[in-house]
Amino acid sequence: MSRGSGAGYDRHITIFSPEGRLFQVEYAFKAVKAAGITSIGVRGKDSVCVVTQKKVPDKLLDQSSVSHLFPVTKYLGLLATGMTADSRSLVTQARNEAAEFRFQYGYEMPADILAKWIADKSQVYTQHAYMRPLGVVAMVLGIDEERGPLLYKCDPAGHFYGHKATSAGMKEQEAINFLEK
C-alpha cells in the first residue's frame, strides 16, 4: 500500500521530499490562493497604488472590520493576501519591528528593510518543526525620500523582490499577465 513518493514528508515542515519540495510551504501558498481574493500593486513615479478584493465571509460580520490593507507606520503600508489571522499576526509583528527600528536608529524604517525582515521571518518559519509557514503573501509599500515609491512582495517561502507591478492571490497569474501587457 504505497502512498506515493511524498508520503510522510508533508507532516514535517523541515524535511525535504526526494523531489526537493517542502510540502508545508506549498500548503501555505495554496492557503493564499484559497482565501479567494486577488491583490494587485503598481508603483508609479510618485506613488504606489494597491487594490484588493473585499470578501466578507459572513453576513453577520461588520464590513468595516474586514480589511487586507494595514498601515505599519506613517510612511509604510502592508497589503496582506491570504489567511486573515496570519495577516493580522504579521502586521502586529511588523508594527513592533518598525517601532523598534525607529527607536534604535532615529528614523523611519525603509520599505526594503521591512520587506527583508518579513522575508527572513517567513524563511525561519520553514526551518523549525514547532513553527509553520504563514499562509500570507505581503506587499510592502512605502514612499522613500531618496528613492521615491517602493513596492515589495514577500511570500511564505521567504522570498522578497522589488516590483514595478505585481499580484498575489487566487487570480495572480492572470493579473500578472495583464500587467505585463
Task: Describe each PLM feature range.
Residues M1-K181:
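Long, low-complexity N-terminal extensions
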